[in-house]
């Protein structure tokens, strides 16, 4: 037996010694589509003179060539070659590679007869399997800024490059995903210039989060690259706060006695320091971001030159830890959280900053050994490469590094200790010899002396030593730079007598073999590598040789230091680095080749509000993308040659050996051990939150601790929490927080003693951003400039005073892509002013304009400040009176002006500050001035039919609403059209700039409302496509339609759930009805939006799960109470819902086109059949209401149900039809076809307006029309239904609400397509009306195919009768819109719904130096704020800062910020059935804005009170899921930004969204005895404001003596009155912003329009409440003036008392008897007799 084993060993040795000829095949292990593949072929051990010819190619493993063949020729003297093999898309597609279902692999094949004939192989091929990737080239995406507000426009660029980083022109696919990961936009484009630019708008309802823009080559699915940006609500800050710790870490070792120190810095965005006070608080933060307040560490400090320093001693910190039972050893892995709020003293604005990266560590350094090889070569040197960094991430230079190396040889070991310091970039490279017998190396590495960082690493020797090893040692272990020559030494190890003659090597970078070479073997063989840009940012050096027939290999990963681009791009601002706003700036762009340079400038304030987390494109990101093509894994080396090749990213075959087939592009992740955390930490950190383990329970607890902006007991709040599991922690934590508030004492002494005992409640709840206001651009210079070496760009800077960061990216055909280092430009004025205006204000309200002057000069500045005169504003001295102000050096000062607006318009308000030598500044902003009262709208529709003798002429009476504001802008807008389809579907209707959404005059907050952006536009596009009428509209209309559809699609995706369903709100459960609605619309929009069919298939699958056994569908969370629409509660609701889902599923069948979806499609079809059976049974019963009957008939007809079912449904529907003349409609039926709510009206006269039906009737009739069109086509019944619907449209083309509008436009579109004709018909309309200047006449000549002049919009006096004459052979429509402001809302429809708004709170304007802020620290009055004596409690600071959008701090010689509390109460009549959603629209008092934090509490907490809120200018919209039958109130705070006096009442409206006619409108006023009702103006400003006010004259005053005929001149010459009465005042009544004096006529002197005036009749006289005029009851007055435009509720004229009115108090008989007054009385009596009998004689 021993002999046999010996012979076997000798035989194997001899066999291995024979060096047989081989063909070696090398390639990257990944093939990229369209990118040439580098292939290395080598001939090994061939006899001299032998020549080998062959070719290489790619093929599908199943067969079929995937590339052209590439020939090669090798010989013993020329034994290797590097080939480039093309991988064309066409060949890959034709070979069937895309059809492979699993990870696609492709074979690299070398084919040569030599392999069969000489190498003794069975075939003439030799190959290796490669992983195929569709990734190719490089794509970079750039946005114009890192963070956006919802509703903002995002501009982006896509740079497309090939594998060599050169411009590529190709097809790209671009997608946008929202913060939920849902795709909201997809585009297929072709880049002709390699730079593609586009933009899209973020929906205004988007939730905060991170969005993503991705781009890929259309044929390369894996070439996807993306960039991220943040979406959240913010406004640019005026200044930025930074927290800088002295050390980026906190040592947690017991012996460390260092203080915790940090610096606070606050600077304006334009670079100047902020004066003010900093309030800082601290907490412990765990890995999940949960914070626990550290009591007793709160600090407040004065800023000096914008800076302050905070120091916490070890004892202070330890005391804070003791209070929460935390030891120092428990801190590892945690962070110390610091938050600072800075309040600046001049303007009182507050900004915040957080520090979240301050870690507790056991060492000051981090130690990284990832660059050290995991394989050692016994007998050679081992290279340990370590990177030492400070905890901040910066390189740690000159840090001692100690290495303890344990060399293990069997059971023996020896320890080697080495010490070396890091170089300038924190690197250390230590080389030490490894004895040949070593099998394992254990490394213990420490960095630093005191408290070192420690790392451990175990390195194994290869298991087999028979073939020896190859050692690769760099001559210089440091990383090379581009341009360096990198030298590596090669040496065989463990081979006593090497027989090979050459080393072979390869250089691999960017996923390709960049070079192959060989070097003759020497004792030490050196290889030189020239490092160029093509090798950056890293490359593998792989060397190998064959020994005894076995490959021996090693590799090394070399990182390149230089991160510069191949070309050159520099941005330089010529001249000064500091500019003034609106200056001209010269930007010099320098390149080293001809290139396109893409520019962009970003306001650096964006980084202060959260944009730092999304850094702009830079070269590090570029190299990261380039390096992603590196298919190698690890630092190099391996147990054997195959692993060396494989880990370097190579595939290899020598005929006998083969590397493993790669299965994935990514590398296997190294397993890391994780230190176990203290399980008891959370309980110790939070005494209350620690009681709950689940995240949901913790959130409920947090919600319970949050204080609401209105009073509710904890029990009341908990009752509103729907989930039982949430209710208990919510109630417990709510009571816990209430106890804290109840125990609070506001005394200063108590606070000083016990402040450390208060719980910082804010750390239990997420932080809110505090928003500030701005009106300046956030980015600009978004342009692409062609540059040839150099270009000087001249641009004008925006008006912002800030620091701009200018970015540049160049793209060159010769040098590729280069990202410039950003350059910054500071825009600043050393003297400037800041101006803030109210959102809006009403006429004759008074407000205080307070511009703040900033002086950063070294000297005091004396300036003159004035407001430029403008019509419509009353200003001091008419605007020419200036205030002389001295602003001390380095400080700020406010200046006050009182302003009274007198005109309802948008007025430019300009403030100018000017000093000597042209020193000064000017700011102009638009002041929005509104009319008094509330807006009222009234619409009328008339049918024009010249073929009807009775309808050829008609009289339209004027409006006589007694509540009209007397001197408003009264008019009636008249619109006439002869082409209803083009008006409704064209650029004035569904395709108007905002779509139908802008025409509805309703909000678009919830998911269903969002669909109004999409559905009507799709309908209109379909109509115009089918009738080929796009050419009749403007050329850009089609593009606008596509844009509207894209926006609607993007918006609705914000409501999608992960399972494909949709809910009315993001926080609300999914709705069957709404999900079906979305499925139907998005199925129709597939082509326009490029939606993924799989997503809609998920939606359809969710709907199928909602079907019950009887075929009906149920809705777990209804959006609308459909019982309202069917009649019978429950039964009809289910029928209508089922029919609705059937319609949606039928339209959704188009998304099941692929084979994978065939099974789901069959399920959908079966579901429709089952549902149709249910609908047929209900229709046969004959008990359906009109709406349920109509939608059922349409669903059965649409899905082609059995004829019997369709007939039953049709007959049931037609039995409920109401026919009036040429109109057919369906009203609301309660439960059977003979029980109608509203009996059909008798045929009306053509001269009467068309009655406007409720939304439900319109929707029902629309479904009936759709059914009739499918059943009978365009017949007589369809004509009548379409005619009725046509005349139900509003003035702007929409209907009542969303559903009736969507369905009706769908129905009318289908009808108009069926009835479309090219026949031209004409309509001539003449309109005439009497005006002040006589008869006004308009003649219109229209036809049914007009585009330009399609419709005319005319304006007539509101009270005038309009006469209409109609001629021609075409029918038409005349619509009238009356819009005016009303005095009060006493006669509104507040019978069904009720709303009440109350405003409470102290509103003070007194300049008080001892202001008390319960939400902040008290500050003494001084020019420079000092540290306050009395601190705020943690709970107060938390609640105070969460209740504001922006805080006005205590100001020097400035008013306290005014706050009020709004309480909104709603309820309804118990008999009223509502659709389920109501909206309260509250117009805020002038000068106020709602506190967003308060509104968010109403919507975001577990005890949700409001479903959603929106703010739009002065409006706050609150969405309620339902209106209770009992009074329910919500509250929120409002803050006054601008001081306003004589504040007028504002309006509030509560209405049913789906039936807006159900509404309640009320006025509410400011708090009584409030300073809001005080007069702010004085002197000439008040005189100007009262210039339009009437003046009361007294007959017995000498100046009124009529010796010179003063009264007669006033009456007959100027202004020449139109009426004259003597009246006795009966009473005075307040009407919004007016006072009404009801008076009885005692004598008629003169009249023009008031022909019915007689003694004893009453007339109303109105005066503005802002005027000082008072007419006393029971006194008699002479009043003469101009006729009014309005009437009272009896139809009698009412008169406005203004500056053109004569008002004289009549003397009593007793006074006229006195001798002193007798003459004056006679003169008055003579005037009355003469004027009444003779009038004016001119």
UniProtKB/Swiss-Prot annotation:
Its main location: secreted. Residues 1-19 form the signal peptide. The record marks 753-754 as: Cleavage. SUPFAM superfamilies: Alpha-macroglobulin receptor domain, Anaphylotoxins (complement system), Terpenoid cyclases/Protein prenyltransferases, TIMP-like. One of its GO terms (molecular function) is endopeptidase inhibitor activity. Pfam families: A2M, A2M_BRD, A2M_recep, ANATO, C4_MG1, CO4A-B_CUB_C, MG2, MG3. GO terms for biological process: complement activation; complement activation, classical pathway; immunoglobulin mediated immune response; inflammatory response; innate immune response. Glycans are attached at residues 224, 743, 1324, 1387. The modification Sulfotyrosine is found at residues 1413, 1416-1417. GO terms for cellular component: axon; dendrite; extracellular space; synapse. Keywords: Cleavage on pair of basic residues, Complement pathway, Disulfide bond, Glycoprotein, Immunity, Inflammatory response, Innate immunity, Phosphoprotein, Secreted, Signal, Sulfation, Thioester bond. Precursor of non-enzymatic components of the classical, lectin and GZMK complement pathways, which consist in a cascade of proteins that leads to phagocytosis and breakdown of pathogens and signaling that strengthens the adaptive immune system. This is Complement C4-B. It comes from Mus musculus (Mouse). The lineage of its organism: Eukaryota, Metazoa, Chordata, Craniata, Vertebrata.
């Amino acid at each position: 037996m021993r002999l046999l084993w010996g012979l076997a060993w000798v035989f194997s040795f001899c066999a291995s010694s024979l060096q047989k000829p081989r063909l070696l095949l090398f390639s990257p292990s990944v093939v990229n589509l369209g990118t040439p593949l580098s292939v290395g072929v080598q001939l090994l051990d061939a006899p001299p003179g032998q020549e080998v010819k062959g070719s290489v190619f790619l093929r599908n493993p199943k067969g079929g060539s995937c590339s052209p063949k590439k020939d090669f020729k090798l010989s013993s003297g020329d034994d290797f070659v590097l080939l480039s093999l093309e991988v064309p898309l066409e060949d890959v597609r034709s070979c069937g590679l895309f059809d492979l279902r699993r990870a696609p692999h492709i074979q690299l094949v070398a084919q040569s007869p030599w392999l069969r004939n000489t190498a003794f192989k069975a075939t003439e091929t030799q190959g290796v399997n490669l992983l195929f990737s569709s990734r190719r080239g490089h794509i970079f995406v750039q946005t114009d800024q890192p963070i956006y507000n919802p509703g903002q426009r995002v501009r982006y660029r896509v740079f497309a490059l090939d594998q060599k980083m050169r411009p590529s022109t190709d097809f790209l696919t671009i997608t946008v995903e929202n913060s939920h990961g849902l795709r909201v936009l997809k585009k297929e484009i072709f880049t002709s210039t390699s730079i593609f630019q586009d933009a899209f708008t973020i929906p205004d309802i988007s939730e905060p989060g991170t969005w993503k823009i991705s781009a890929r080559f259309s044929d390369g699915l894996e070439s996807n690259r993306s960039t991220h940006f943040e979406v959240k609500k913010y406004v640019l800050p005026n200044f930025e706060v930074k927290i800088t710790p002295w050390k980026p870490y906190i040592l947690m070792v017991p012996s460390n006695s260092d203080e915790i120190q940090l610096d606070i810095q606050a600077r304006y965005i334009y670079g100047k320091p902020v004066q003010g006070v900093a309030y800082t608080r601290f907490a412990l933060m765990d890995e999940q971001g949960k914070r626990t307040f550290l009591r007793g560490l709160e600090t407040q400090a004065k800023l000096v030159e914008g800076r302050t320093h905070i120091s916490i001693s070890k004892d202070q910190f330890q005391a804070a830890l003791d209070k929460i039972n935390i030891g120092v050893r428990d801190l590892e892995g945690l962070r110390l959280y610091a938050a600072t709020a800075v309040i600046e003293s001049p303007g009182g604005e507050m900004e915040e900053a957080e520090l979240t990266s301050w870690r507790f560590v056991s060492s000051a350094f981090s130690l990284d050994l990832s660059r050290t090889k995991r394989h050692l070569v016994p007998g050679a040197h081992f290279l340990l490469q370590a990177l030492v960094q400070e905890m901040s991430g910066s390189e740690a230079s000159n840090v001692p590094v100690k290495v303890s190396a344990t060399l293990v040889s069997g059971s023996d070991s020896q320890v080697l200790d080495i010490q070396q310091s890091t170089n300038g970039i924190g690197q250390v490279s230590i080389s030490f010899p490894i004895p040949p017998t070593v099998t394992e190396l254990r490394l213990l590495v420490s960095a630093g002396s005191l408290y070192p960082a420690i790392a451990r690493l175990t390195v194994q020797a290869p298991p087999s030593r028979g073939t020896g090893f190859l050692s690769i040692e760099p001559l210089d272990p440091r990383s090379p730079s581009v341009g360096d020559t990198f030298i590596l030494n090669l040496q065989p190890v463990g081979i006593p007598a090497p027989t090979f003659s050459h080393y072979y090597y390869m250089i691999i970078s960017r996923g390709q073999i960049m070079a192959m070479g060989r070097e003759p073997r020497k004792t030490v063989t050196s290889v030189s590598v020239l490092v160029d840009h093509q090798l950056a940012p890293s490359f593998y050096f792989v060397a190998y040789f064959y020994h005894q027939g076995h490959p021996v290999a090693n590799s090394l990963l070399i990182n390149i230091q230089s991160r510069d681009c191949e070309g050159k791009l520099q941005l330089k601002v010529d001249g000064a680095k500091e500019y003034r706003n609106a200056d001209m700036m010269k930007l010099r762009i320098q390149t080293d080749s001809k290139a396109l340079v893409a520019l962009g400038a970003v306001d650096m304030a964006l980084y202060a509000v959260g944009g730092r987390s999304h850094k702009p494109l830079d070269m590090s990101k570029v190299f990261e993308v380039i390096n992603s093509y590196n298919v190698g894994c690890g630092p190099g080396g391996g147990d054997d040659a195959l692993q060396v090749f494989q880990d370097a990213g190579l595939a290899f075959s020598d005929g006998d050996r083969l590397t493993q087939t790669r299965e994935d592009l990514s590398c296997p992740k190294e397993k890391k051990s994780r230190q176990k955390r203290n399980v008891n930490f959370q309980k110790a950190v939070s005494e209350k939150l620690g009681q709950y383990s689940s995240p949901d329970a913790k959130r409920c607890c947090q919600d319970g601790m949050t204080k609401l902006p209105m009073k509710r007991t904890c029990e009341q709040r908990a009752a509103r929490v729907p989930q039982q599991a949430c209710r208990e922690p919510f109630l417990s934590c709510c009571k816990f927080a209430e106890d804290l508030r109840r125990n609070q004492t506001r005394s200063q002494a108590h606070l000083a003693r016990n402040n450390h005992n208060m719980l910082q409640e804010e750390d239990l709840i997420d932080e809110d951003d505090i928003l500030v206001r701005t009106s300046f651009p956030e980015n600009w210079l978004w342009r692409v400039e062609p540059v040839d070496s150099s270009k000087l760009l001249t641009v004008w800077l925006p008006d912002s005073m800030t620091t701009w960061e200018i970015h540049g990216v160049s793209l060159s055909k010769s040098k590729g892509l280069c990202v410039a280092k950003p350059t910054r430009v500071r825009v600043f004025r050393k003297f400037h002013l800041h101006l803030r205006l109210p959102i809006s204000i009403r006429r004759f309200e008074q407000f205080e304009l307070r511009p703040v002057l900033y002086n950063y000069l070294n000297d005091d500045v004396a300036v003159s400040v004035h407001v430029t005169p403008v019509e419509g504003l009353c200003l001091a001295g008419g605007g020419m009176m200036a205030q002389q102000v001295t602003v001390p050096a380095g400080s700020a000062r406010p200046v006050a002006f009182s302003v009274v607006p007198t005109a309802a318009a948008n007025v430019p308000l300009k403030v100018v500050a000017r000093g000597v030598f042209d020193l000064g500044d000017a700011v102009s902003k638009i002041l929005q001035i509104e009319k008094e009262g509330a807006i009222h709208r009234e619409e009328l529709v008339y049918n024009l039919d010249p073929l009807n003798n009775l309808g050829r002429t008609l009289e339209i009476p004027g409006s006589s609403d007694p509540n009209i504001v007397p001197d408003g802008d009264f008019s009636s807008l008249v619109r006439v059209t002869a082409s209803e389809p083009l008006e409704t579907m064209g650029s004035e209707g569904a395709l108007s700039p905002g779509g139908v959404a802008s025409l509805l005059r309703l909000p678009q907050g919830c998911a269903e409302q969002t669909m109004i952006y999409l559905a009507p536009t799709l309908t209109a596009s379909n109509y115009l496509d089918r009738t080929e009428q796009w050419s009749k509209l403007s050329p850009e209309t089609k593009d606008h339609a596509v844009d509207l559809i894209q926006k609607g699609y993007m918006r609705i995706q914000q409501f999608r759930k992960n399972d494909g369903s949709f809910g009315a709100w993001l926080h609300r459960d999914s709705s069957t009805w709404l999900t079906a609605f979305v499925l139907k619309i998005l199925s129709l929009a597939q082509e326009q939006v490029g939606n993924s069919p799989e997503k809609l298939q998920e939606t359809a699958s969710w709907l199928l799960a909602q079907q019950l056994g009887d075929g009906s569908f149920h809705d777990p969370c209804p959006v609308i109470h459909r019982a309202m629409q069917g009649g019978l509660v429950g039964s009809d609701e289910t029928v209508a819902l089922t029919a609705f889902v059937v319609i949606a599923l039928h339209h959704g069948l188009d998304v099941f086109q692929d084979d994978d979806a065939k099974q789901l499609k069959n399920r959908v079809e079966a579901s429709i059949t089952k549902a149709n059976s249910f609908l047929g049974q209900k229709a046969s019963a004959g008990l359906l209401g009109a709406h349920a009957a109509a939608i059922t008939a349409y669903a059965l007809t649409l899905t082609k149900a059995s004829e019997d079912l369709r007939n039953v449904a049709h007959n049931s529907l037609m039995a409920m039809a109401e026919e009036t003349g040429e109109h057919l409609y369906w009203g609301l039926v309660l439960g059977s076809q003979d029980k109608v709510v509203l009996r059909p009206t008798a045929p009306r006269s053509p001269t009467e307006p068309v009655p406007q039906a409720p939304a439900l009737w319109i929707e029902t009739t629309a479904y009936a029309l759709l059914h009739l069109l499918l059943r009978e086509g365009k017949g007589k019944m369809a004509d009548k239904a379409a005619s009725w619907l046509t005349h139900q449209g509003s003035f702007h083309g929409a209907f009542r609400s969303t559903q009736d509008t969507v369905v009706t436009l769908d129905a009318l579109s289908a009808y108009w397509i069926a009835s479309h004709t090219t026949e031209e018909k004409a309509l001539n309309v003449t309109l005439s009306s009497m005006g002040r200047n006589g008869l006004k006449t308009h003649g219109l000549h229209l036809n049914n195919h007009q585009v330009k002049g399609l419709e005319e919009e005319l304006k007539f006096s509101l009270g005038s009768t309009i006469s209409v004459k109609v001629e021609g052979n075409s029918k038409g429509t005349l619509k009238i819109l009356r819009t005016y402001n009303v005095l009060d809302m006493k006669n509104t429809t507040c019978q069904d719904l009720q709303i009440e708004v109350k405003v409470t709170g102290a509103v003070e304007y007194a300049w008080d130096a001892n202001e008390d802020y319960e939400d902040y620290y008290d500050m003494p009055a001084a020019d420079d704020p000092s540290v306050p004596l009395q601190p705020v409690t943690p709970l107060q600071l938390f609640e105070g800062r969460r209740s504001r959008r922006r805080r006005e701090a205590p100001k020097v010689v400035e008013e306290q910020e005014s706050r009020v509390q709004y309480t909104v109460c709603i309820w309804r009549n118990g008999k009223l059935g509502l659709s389920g959603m109501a909206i309260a629209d509250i117009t805020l008092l002038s000068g106020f804005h709602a506190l967003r934090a308060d509104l968010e509490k109403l919507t975001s907490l577990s005890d949700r009170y409001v479903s959603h809120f929106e703010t739009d200018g002065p409006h706050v919209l609150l969405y309620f899921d339902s209106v209770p039958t009992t009074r329910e109130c919500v509250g929120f705070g409002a803050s006054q930004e601008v001081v306003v006096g004589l504040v007028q009442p504002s309006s509030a409206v509560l209405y049913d969204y789906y039936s807006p006619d159900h509404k309640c409108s009320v006025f509410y006023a400011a708090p009584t005895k409030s300073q809001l009702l005080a007069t702010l103006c004085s002197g000439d400003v008040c005189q100007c404001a009262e210039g339009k006010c009437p003046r009361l004259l007294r007959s017995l005053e000498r100046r009124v003596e009529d010796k010179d005929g003063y009264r007669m001149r006033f009456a007959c010459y100027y202004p020449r009155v139109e009426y004259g009465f003597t009246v006795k005042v009966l009473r005075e009544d307040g009407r919004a912003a007016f006072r009404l004096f009801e008076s009885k006529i005692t004598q008629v002197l003169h009249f023009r329009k008031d022909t019915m005036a007689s003694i004893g009749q009453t007339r109303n006289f109105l005066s503005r409440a802002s005027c000082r005029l008072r007419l006393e009851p029971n006194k008699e007055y002479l009043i003469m003036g101009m006729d009014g435009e309005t009437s009272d509720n009896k139809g009698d004229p009412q008169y406005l008392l203004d500056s053109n009115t004569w008002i004289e108090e009549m003397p009593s008989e007793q006074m006229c008897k006195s001798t002193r007054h007798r003459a004056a009385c006679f003169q008055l009596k003579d005037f009355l007799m003469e004027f009444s009998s003779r009038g004016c004689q001119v």
